[in-house]
């Protein structure tokens, strides 16, 4: 699959945000688990306020799922793994069965 075809999960965070720091390991695990179906990018809002403004980030952490160059879904604030996975399942391509 072409890299650009996979949906992109953008994690807006700040080093100063405790809730965002606590989500780091959860997202790292999720990125490894779903690496065939999505990409993950981290954006520090303190270093890239332009992107935070463009995506209308009002709080950190914020997750924005970009699919086909459009925002498909978002979760604002600290959220649990089940909520993130539920959001992703609605938008990620189905896993292809492994060859026998």
Question: What are the residue ranges of the model-derived segments?
Answer:
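Non-catalytic, surface beta->alpha helical segment in thiol-disulfide oxidoreductase systems
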Residues: 64-99
């Amino acid at each position: 699959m072409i890299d650009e075809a996979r949906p992109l999960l953008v994690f807006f965070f700040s080093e100063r945000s405790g809730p965002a720091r606590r989500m780091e390991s959860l997202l790292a695990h999720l990125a490894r688990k779903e690496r065939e179906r999505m990409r993950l990018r981290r954006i520090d809002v303190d270093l890239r306020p332009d992107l935070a403004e463009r995506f209308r980030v009002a709080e950190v952490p914020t997750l924005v799922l970009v699919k086909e160059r459009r925002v498909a879904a978002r979760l604002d604030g600290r959220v649990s793994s089940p909520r993130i996975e539920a959001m992703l399942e609605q938008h990620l391509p189905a896993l292809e069965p492994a060859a026998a």
